């Protein structure tokens, strides 16, 4: 056999052995995933997606999504290279329980409280501010006069476990108003109940709106934040850095993204 043929044979065998060894190592050594458009490692972030909150989070995960809450998340991800969202739908109460248990990683639009801060991390800066109102149909002239006593004995719709309900019910109690409360899941269901005359009024924030509802009484306000489980300080570090970057580019972003979906 010629020397050149022997050399080719040796090279081929060596290459075959090397490829086989690489295949074995690839099977046992995990290879990190990276974002397609960067050298950043992919970080899957499970985000709570509120049902029945049109304007804030529209659509169903797996289909077309929109809303100012969705737009804010997309802007946030631009400044957090490698983030990949996985949306998990549910009611506010369900999603908060999942967040505290670490079953999801992120919830937007969460008001701060000392009780919540025992289980969650909040962004250093607020995502925005919301005002709380008692809404009624525009033709309720009795409520439009501004006298809280006109609410006496009415049936008022509210969401369970949310800040505007706590604040609104406390305001009503301070005014000496006795009402019947009826709970619904999501802001859209509240406005539907009002439109269908299931309730006389509703307690709601101004993050979503309805042409069939007018704010009659202002009952309070609060800032709201991004929140993550205490076990995910890495995510909160990313969020704080991203929010600072967004504010440097557009200090009015928090107001503008919300205004895009105002009725």
Please give the residue ranges for each predicted region.
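Extended ligand-binding regions for polar small-molecule ligands
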Residues: 67-80, 138-163, 219-263
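Bacterial N-terminal signal peptides
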Residues: 14-27
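Sec-dependent signal peptide cleavage junction
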Residues: 24-39
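N-terminal secretory signal peptides that target proteins for export/translocation
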Residues: 1-10
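Acidic, polar ligand-binding/catalytic clefts
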Residues: 70, 74, 86-150, 206-221, ...
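Pocket-lining segment of extracytoplasmic ligand-binding domains
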Residues: 136-211
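Short, solvent-exposed loop/turn elements at domain surfaces
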Residues: 54-60, 116, 143, 166, ...
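Extracytoplasmic small-molecule ligand-binding "clamshell" domains
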Residues: 36-118, 158, 174-176, 180-184
């Amino acid at each position: 056999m010629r020397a050149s043929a022997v050399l080719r044979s040796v090279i081929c065998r060596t290459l075959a052995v090397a490829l086989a060894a690489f295949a074995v190592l690839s099977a046992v050594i995990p290879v990190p995933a990276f974002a397609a458009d960067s050298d950043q490692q992919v970080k899957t972030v499970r985000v709570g997606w509120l049902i029945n909150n049109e304007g804030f989070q529209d659509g169903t995960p797996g289909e077309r999504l929109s809303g100012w809450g969705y737009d804010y998340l997309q802007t946030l991800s631009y400044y957090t290279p490698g983030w990949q969202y996985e949306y998990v739908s549910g009611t506010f109460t369900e999603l908060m329980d999942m967040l505290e248990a670490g079953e999801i990683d992120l919830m937007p639009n969460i008001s701060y409280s000392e009780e919540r801060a025992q289980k969650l991390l909040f962004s250093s800066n607020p995502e925005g501010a919301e005002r709380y109102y008692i809404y009624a149909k525009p033709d309720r002239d009795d409520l439009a006069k501004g006298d809280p006593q006109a609410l006496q004995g009415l049936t008022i719709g509210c969401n369970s476990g949310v800040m505007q309900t706590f604040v609104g019910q406390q305001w009503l109690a301070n005014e000496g108003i006795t009402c019947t409360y009826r709970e619904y899941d999501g802001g859209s269901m509240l406005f539907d109940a009002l439109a269908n005359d299931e309730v006389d009024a509703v307690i709601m924030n101004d993050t979503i709106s309805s042409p069939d509802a007018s704010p009659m009484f202002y009952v309070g306000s609060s800032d709201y934040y991004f929140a993550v489980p205490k076990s995910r300080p890495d995510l909160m570090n990313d969020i704080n850095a991203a929010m600072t970057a967004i504010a440097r580019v557009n200090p009015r972003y928090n107001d503008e993204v919300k205004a895009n979906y105002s009725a």
